Amino acid sequence: MPHSYPALSAEQKKELSDIALRIVTPGKGILAADESVGSMAKRLSQIGVENTEENRRLYRQVLFSADDRVKKCIGGVIFFHETLYQKDDNGVPFVRTIQDKGILVGIKVDKGVVPLAGTDGETTTQGLDGLLERCAQYKKDGADFAKWRCVLKISDRTPSALAILENANVLARYASICQQNGIVPIVEPEILPDGDHDLKRCQYVTEKVLAAVYKALSDHHVYLEGTLLKPNMVTPGHACPIKYSPEEIAMATVTALRRTVPPAVPGVTFLSGGQSEEEASLNLNAINRCPLPRPWALTFSYGRALQASALNAWRGQRDNAGAATEEFIKRAEMNGLAAQGRYEGSGDGGAAAQSLYIANHAY
């Protein structure tokens, strides 16, 4: 095998590694505020608010106006394209609002899932066309990391070898393109929680998918120290009759990661996958208390599980903005503790305990 020409200089590698480590500083995680216009329609309709650009801006402002308390628990915020170019009520760009808190700005760069022919309803993710140019522009506009989501589902016949291979290679192409532009790629192979499969089946599939992803990243010469992984936790399917404890979920999750994710990867930022706010915090806490060695930071990259209570408090009313922002800060602080294994539970049986599951979830 001939020696491959190094794709990145030592300076480029250092920049990528520094960005990745900053995002997953102990006790910090990611706010995923990258819901597409279509996803925001679902969120806003739940509270009876019209899905307009201005209402989306006002809602993002609720999250982004959080005070300096979030600095110690949020290391990065993932933006949607529209939000990257919006401003707050005072005319300050949202990007600057976030950067002024010492938080890094990320951008969702995929263009959604499309059917994968020759499979039983499986998908691949589009958006590689023009990605190089978009990454170069996003870097100029303040983004230091990116996110790309691939989706796999568990059934009797899925995920197929074809879907696993295709999605792993798409993620690797995306990661390589990001790194050439000084952007840290968050690699997100989400295995949906739809179905009645048990914990063991999800663990097996998660291991197979992650093994394929890291093989593809190696094939594409991706610099692992300058990446982050955004996987699902290993959980039973939503229709599974067996209930598992956070400790069982933690053991299955950490075992799957230990078997597949190289220690060179600086951090694993879990998606919440429709868990309730409280469940997502308790499971993350259990993962960080798991008695197995864990060479990576294990933290959060939550959307709904950081925002649900804030959204309910806001309800589209300017007068509620302050209270809604407080709800977001409270949840962010709880997850900051969970990322260190120091969360004791909120004892909140209310909104925070409500399932946020959406069948066949698409952003």
Swiss-Prot record:
Q: Could you tell me one molecular function GO term of this UniProt entry?
A: cytoskeletal protein binding
Q: Which residues carry this modification: N6-acetyllysine?
A: K111
What is an example of a Pfam family matching this protein?
Glycolytic
- Please name the Gene3D superfamilies in this protein's record: Aldolase class I (3.20.20.70)
Q: What is its EC number?
A: 4.1.2.13
- Substrates-to-products reaction catalysed: beta-D-fructose 1,6-bisphosphate = D-glyceraldehyde 3-phosphate + dihydroxyacetone phosphate
Pathway in which the depicted protein is active = Carbohydrate degradation; glycolysis; D-glyceraldehyde 3-phosphate and glycerone phosphate from D-glucose: step 4/4
Q: Which domain of life is it from?
A: Eukaryota
Modified residue annotations for Phosphoserine? S36, S39, S45
| InterPro entries with a match to the protein in the record | Aldolase_I_AS, Aldolase_TIM, FBA_I
Q: Which GO terms describe its biological process?
A: epithelial cell differentiation; fructose 1,6-bisphosphate metabolic process; gluconeogenesis; glycolytic process
Q: Where is the active site?
A: E188 (proton acceptor), K230 (schiff-base intermediate with dihydroxyacetone-p)
Residues that the record marks as modified (Phosphotyrosine) are Y5
- Annotated membrane-spanning segments are none
Residue numbers binding substrate = R56, K147
Under which main EC class is this enzyme filed? Answer: lyase
Q: In which tissues is it expressed?
A: Expressed exclusively in Purkinje cells in bands running from anterior to posterior across most of the cerebellum. Expressed at higher levels in the brains of BSE-infected animals.
**Assembly:** Homotetramer. Interacts with ATP6V1E1.
What further note is attached to this protein's record?
In vertebrates, three forms of this ubiquitous glycolytic enzyme are found, aldolase A in muscle, aldolase B in liver and aldolase C in brain.
Task: Describe the family membership recorded for this protein in Swiss-Prot or TrEMBL.
Answer: Belongs to the class I fructose-bisphosphate aldolase family.
Q: What is this protein called?
A: Fructose-bisphosphate aldolase C
Lineage of the source organism? Eukaryota, Metazoa, Chordata, Craniata, Vertebrata
Record gene name = Aldoc
